[in-house]
A protein has these predicted regions:
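Short, well-ordered beta-strand segments in beta-rich or mixed alpha/beta enzyme
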Residues: 2-8, 39-66
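N-terminal first-folded block
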Residues: 2-32, 36
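Intrinsically disordered, low-complexity acidic/polar segments
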Residues: 15-17, 49, 61, 99
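Glycine-rich beta-strand-turn "strand-cap" elements at beta-sheet edges
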Residues: 40-45, 73-103
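An amphipathic, aromatic/His-enriched active-site/gating alpha helix that lines ligand/cofactor pockets
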Residues: 24-36, 55-89
Length: 103
């Protein structure tokens, strides 16, 4: 498993554009193999701060995701409307429970 937590901050007045771009990425991942979790969130106390949690079944799945046309189109556009704050590689452990929202 390969997991990452990415933090980005929308540039002033660009929050809606960040949401539009990332929502498009989320739709794309529904068709990709090897992505177990792909969650986008904002901070409750700072709605211009975005946190993206990705969990891939393998390094190959992550590499394949980053090679998609959608990823290659979205990332440069996203960097125009948001600042990259940081990314943390995570080491998942223990059992996972995933329940889709609204289930």
């Amino acid at each position: 498993m390969h997991a990452f937590l990415t933090h980005m901050r929308a540039k002033p007045g660009k929050r809606d554009e960040v949401i539009r771009l990332t929502t498009g990425m989320l739709e794309q991942t529904q068709t990709e193999d090897g992505i177990s979790i792909y969650v986008f969130s904002t901070a409750k106390d700072s709605p211009d701060d975005f946190y993206f949690y990705d969990l891939y079944e393998s390094e190959e799945a992550r590499t394949a995701h980053e090679a998609t046309e959608k990823f290659k189109e979205t990332m440069p556009a996203l960097m125009q409307v948001a600042d990259f704050v940081g990314v943390t590689a995570l080491e998942p452990y223990g059992p996972m429970k995933i329940t889709p929202p609204g289930s």
